Structures are given as structure tokens and as C-alpha cells.
Amino acid sequence: KYIAFAFGASAFIFSGCSDSFLDKTPDERVEINTPTKCVQLLNTAYPEGSYGWVCEISSDNIADNNAPHYPSNPNAKQILTHYNLGTYDRTDDEMYRFEPGVSSTSQDSPSFLWNTFYNSVHAANYVLEAINDGKVNSDGSGYDLKVAAAEAKLIRAYDHFILVNVFSQAYKDPEASKKDIGVPYVTVPETNTGVKYDRGNVAEVYDKIQQDLEEGLAGISDANYRTAPKYHFNVNAAHAFAARFYLFKRDYKKVIEHANAVLGTDSATIYSQLMDWAPFDSCSSSGDYAKVWQDFNSSNNLMIMGTYSNIMRHALGYRFALVGQPARDVIFHSSPMWQSYAANPSCLVGGYLFWTGEDYGYTAGKIAERFQYTDRLAGTGFVHTMRREFTRSELLLERAEAEIMLGQYDNAFQDMNLYTRGMQKFSPATYRTYQSQARMRPLSRDMLDSYYALSSNPNCFADWNFTQQMSSSFVVPAEAVKYMNCLNDLRRFEVLWDGLRFFDLKRWGIEYSHTYGPDATVYTLKWNDPRRALEIPAAAIQAGLQPSHSTTETPGSAKKVAFDEFFSDPTPSAVSASNNAKLDNSESYVIKK
């Protein structure tokens, strides 16, 4: 079989270890007939799109600068204000109003996400077909074909996991999810033109993901990753993916099993491997912060993915941003874990407060871009954002959530306490500063019993009965509410800008709203709103796939469609190299006495 090797974001990342094989022109056909070629194709098989911005603007983390809102900083004069800012992309306006995002097909659009993830599926299927057909001959490289096949299955499972969570309703339970439209689960290369697909249902897609995931886990090792294991589904990343999958499926014992495979159970060891905030002391530019966050050698980072994404530009100085109430809920609020500061000190240390100099919103150094010039004279090229797709910090919170839902409250407290200690793992000098000025301390049981028991505090609810709308089996008992409030607060901070907040809102059944424009029009998403599943690309609908927002068709009732009819090659757009990010003055967040 043959495939054209895409020379995109993944190849950009791997340029330091590429050889003549990867330097082939994009349209040159290469036969996949050796272990080396299988492994090299897998190097570039990871999705080049990012779900970060698409999901952030669809969540409660983004507000409209042009709608009346109070300043982000509680220390500022509290008067309602609104601006007259333009959008970075017309699709942002559509998505913020929970409409189909159809005006753009370039990076950070639903169409680009759809096509890049199916392109990744396409490449994984080529590797699997070559191996399964027995067409791969030994070349003395020492690469293990079983490991290559396992990696391909993990890529395919991951791609469909993201696709179904973006373009379908959240998983509810085995029966209820049969009534929700899924996504095509593609298992053969495009060359098999006789194979056609429908969207099936969410339950079917989850079953197929689980099969690929379990088969991938059974065969994966780090044997084939000789230079850059964290750009692949290494063993730890595979277990982290499994923990996330089973959390979304609410198989909590398996969440803990796979989290333990990575984290272990020794608190001192886990703490030592969480994010190290000390290197931020020497950072000043967004690029400096990005290097620390995205550090390949960081023990906290389990898997890093290179993407075409302009996420920092979308949210910096334009209409839709982390501003006003969302900014307060995530960053700008007091807490018993820090006092005398109106902002989370971890945000001040870790570079979460990049802005334009006006209160138009904030972005974080963790999503700062790396620029690839295509025309230095014109100053244009492609923006790459490195995603920290799986981290120990997030995995620790996933384990804590599973422990809460199993009634293991002591274990959940220990994990959340450990997470908050990790949030404060500053250099000694920086820690002394914030401990004395902000009176920093980790989560305590008193905080759980007081602060997190009050629904008036950010990210806290009086009860979590809304989860039962998703499934009668999804019950958060009264004694677990304060733990889930704490988990929600910590997790919302941890996954900020990653896109995962949108998935959390969906899977928990949380109702939320967007306020739009100077007239303050309110758009609300209830737990079962069809718009909680983003609309698939117009071209896929025209080919015959069911729309996500269909209310008349049952899953699988539309005609079946060939892969090349609902997929097209994704094409990123070149942009200018300049951006206007600068770090805010943290002194403005000291609470005035």
C-alpha cells in the first residue's frame, strides 16, 4: 500500500531527527514495506490540529468583550463596561453563539479539527493494513512491528475519542448513549473505496475506542522510540489516555488502575514528578514560559503534541477572551489557599497573565506559539502550538475524581492536597515571597468543610444533582459535594486553554450561558441541548453524514458515506510572525488595604 507522507506540524517537530525518507516531497508515494517506514510514518501520524480553541470558546472559560462585564481584576474600579473589538476569525463569533462554525476551514476551526484528526486516523490505518497484510519485510532496523501496530491502534483510538467528544454528545451510559449520534469509526485506509460509514452512535464509538485502546495497551512499549518518546504514545501516555477514557465512561476502578500505573502510590515520589515552577523565575517573554511548560524533559509532561494552532492570537486583544467573570472564576479570586492577593499566585509565577496592556483578556505562556517561517522577507509563516496532551498533574486530579465517585474520600483529599502542594512548588525565594505576602498553603480539611461547602464561591455548587440528568447511575451524594466542588475548581485551573473544560461541562451535565453583544443577549446550553455536540463540517453533511444537530433522524439512519467523501486534506493558513503578547504587572493584584 502507498501513502503520501504529510510534511506538517509533526514533521516540523521531528525535524531534528528526520532523515532522507521524511524529507520526501509531500506528494511522493512511498511504499510501506519495512519496519523503518512504518515507524517513520507513525512519527508524522499524530493529528496536526488542536481542539484547544474550538473547545475553549464553546465552554464557560470565554466571554465577549463587547458585552457588558465587570473588569477581570477585582482591584479595579467595578463598573460595567464593554468594547467594540473585532473577532480574530468570523468562526469565533458563530461558535460563541453556539452556531455551526462554518465561516472558516483553517486552523482552529471545527472543519480543520475534523480533517486533521481523520487524516491521523488515515495514516494509522495505513500502518495497520501494511502490518496485517504481511507486506512488511525485515530490514534489520530492530524496530518491533507489534509495538508499531499498538501505537497505531492507540492513535486511532485517541483520534476517535477526541472526535466523538467534540462532535457528539457526552457519554451517558451504555443504553442512553445508543440514542446519541456518534462519529464514523474508520478502520481501513482510504484506498478501500468499497467501505462506507455512517456516524453510528456514541455507545458504539466508545466500544470501538475501548477495543483499540486495550489492544494498544497490551502491545505498547517504548522500544521503537529512540529519540523522542514523549512525542509518541509511550507507555505512561498510553495509561494516561486510558485513565481519561475510563473517567469519561465512569469506570472508576480502571481510572485508578491506569493512574497508578503512571503515578504510583508514594506521595513523595508523585510530588517530585509534578510540575516544577522554579524555572519560571528566569522567564520574561511568552516564549520563555512556553519552553518551561512544554519542556520535553519535564517529568510532569507525559506526551507532547505539535499542532497548527493560533490559539494565543484568537484570545489576545480580540472580542472573545478569558475576561470578566470567567477570568475571575479561574484566576482572579481570593481563596483560603492564598490571601492578600486577588489572583492565584501560581498564575503570577507561571505566566498566565499575558495581555495587550488593556483589560481585553489574558492568555498563558503554556500555549505560547512557536513560529515557522515560510517567507522571512514577508514575515509570514505558520504558528505551531505544542500541546501538553497528558500530564501527571491532570492525571492526579483524574484519580481524585474517581476516588470521590467511589466514596474513597480520604484518598481523594490526599491527592487534591498533593496537587495543591504541587501548584506551589516554587523556587525557595519565590515561595518565601508568596508565603509571607499571600500566606500560601495547600488544601486542608478545614478548607473543604468551609470554603468548598459554600455554593457562593467560584466553581462551587449547592449540590451535584445535575449529573443524574446524564444518567440515573451518575449520582454524586451529598457528602461528596464539597469534594467535587474542590475537584471542579482545581481541574478548571489545571486544564485552562487545553479544551478539556468543554468536555467536563458536557460529561457532568452542567448548564451554562454566553452573554453576547452590547445588548447582552444570553445563549444558554442546557444539559441535553443538541448544540453541545459541535456541528460537523458542511462538506461532510453535503456528502450524506447526519448533522450533529439533527433532531429528526435516529443514529445511523442516514446513508453511508465513503471516507474520501466526508474527509478532505486540511490546509493551514499562513499568518504574520508578529504578536502583541506582554506580561502583566503582578503588583496590580496585591489586595489594597
Question: Whereabouts are the PLM-identified features?
Answer:
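Conserved, well-structured interaction surfaces
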Residues: 87-167, 200, 213-225, 380-387, ...
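Sec-dependent bacterial lipoprotein signal peptides
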Residues: 1-16
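Membrane-proximal, proline-rich intrinsically disordered regions
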Residues: 17-74, 322, 331-332, 509-593
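Hydrophobic-face positions in mid-chain alpha helices that act as interaction patches
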Residues: 58, 256-393, 417, 423-474, ...
